[in-house]
C-alpha cells in the first residue's frame, strides 16, 4: 500500500480515480482518455501547489518517508566497486553505520553513512539507524584509513539520533561521539557530508564535522526532534508541527543560518519519487566540490573545516570590550 500523508491525500484520491478510469477503460473497452488526461492535469497542478508550499513539519514527514532512499541506495547509484568494511576492532560491528571504500568517477574515496532498514527485521538489525558507540568508532577507524591513504571522505547523515540505551551509555556513547568530533576536525583530507533524511543531534554530528555540509531539499538537521522539543517546551508532544516551525531546522532555514553550505534539489514530492534523479543531483554536487579540493593542500583543507565551525552562531566578544575599557 502506498504511503501518503494527510497533506497528500487529495493527490492520492485523484490517483485512485485515474486508476479506476484506466481499469474501466480496459475492462469495458471504453475510450476514457480525455477524462484521464484531465484528471492527470488536475493532479499535476495540485502537486505543484502542495509541494511548492510545504511547511516545516510536512518536510520532516517527507524526510521520514519509509520509501525514501537510504545511504546504501545512494552508494549503489553514485559509486562503483564499493567494498564494505566492518567492525571497530574494540567491541563489534554496528550495522547502523555503513562504511567502505569505493570509486567516484574512477577516483578512490571512503563512504560512510547511517543505514536504516526497510523491513521490521532489517530495522531491528540496523537499530533503526541509531548507532551505538561501536558504530562511531568504526566510522572513525575508517576515516583514519582515509587520512592515511589520502582519500576524500563522503558521509551520508540519516538518523533520528545516537542510540540512548543503557548498553550504549555503558560502552561510552558520549565519549565515542566526542572523540569523532575531535578527530574529524584534525583530518587532512576533504570531508563532505550530505543530510539525506533525518539529521538528529549528536548522532548526526558524529559523522558530520566536514568541510562542506549539504542538505537534501526535504531533509532536516536538528539538536532535538520536533516531538522532543514540543514535549519539553509545550509539555505536549502533539504540538510537534509548531515546534518544527519555530526550530528553523529545514534546509532553507539551515542555509540562512549558515549551518549548512548548500541545498541539493529533490524531485517534486521528495527523493522517493525518483531516487535516480536525486542521486544524479548529489553526484553533480560531489563532483564539483571534490574537483575543488584537488587543488588545495592538506593544511588548507583542515583550516577551511576549522574556520567553518568557528564562524557558526551569533556571539559577542565581551573580553575584548573589557580590555578596551581598562585601557
Swiss-Prot record:
Domain CoA carboxyltransferase C-terminal intervals: 38-292
SUPFAM superfamilies: ClpP/crotonase
Gene name of the record: accA
EC annotation from Swiss-Prot or TrEMBL: 2.1.3.15
InterPro entries in alphabetical order: Acetyl_CoA_COase_a_su, ClpP/crotonase-like_dom_sf, COA_CT_C
Cellular component GO terms held in the UniProt record: acetyl-CoA carboxylase complex
NCBIfam families: accA, AccA_sub, PRK05724.1
Family stated for the protein in its record: Belongs to the AccA family.
Primary role: Component of the acetyl coenzyme A carboxylase (ACC) complex. First, biotin carboxylase catalyzes the carboxylation of biotin on its carrier protein (BCCP) and then the CO(2) group is transferred by the carboxyltransferase to acetyl-CoA to form malonyl-CoA.
Keywords: ATP-binding, Cytoplasm, Fatty acid biosynthesis, Fatty acid metabolism, Lipid biosynthesis, Lipid metabolism, Nucleotide-binding, Transferase
GO BP terms in the entry: fatty acid biosynthetic process; malonyl-CoA biosynthetic process
Protein's pathway: Lipid metabolism; malonyl-CoA biosynthesis; malonyl-CoA from acetyl-CoA: step 1/1
Subunit-structure text: Acetyl-CoA carboxylase is a heterohexamer composed of biotin carboxyl carrier protein (AccB), biotin carboxylase (AccC) and two subunits each of ACCase subunit alpha (AccA) and ACCase subunit beta (AccD).
Molecular function per GO: acetyl-CoA carboxylase activity; ATP binding; carboxyl- or carbamoyltransferase activity
UniProt-annotated location(s): Cytoplasm
Protein's name according to its UniProt entry: Acetyl-coenzyme A carboxylase carboxyl transferase subunit alpha
Lineage of the species this protein comes from: Bacteria, Pseudomonadati, Elusimicrobiota, Endomicrobiia, Endomicrobiales
Catalytic activity: N(6)-carboxybiotinyl-L-lysyl-[protein] + acetyl-CoA = N(6)-biotinyl-L-lysyl-[protein] + malonyl-CoA
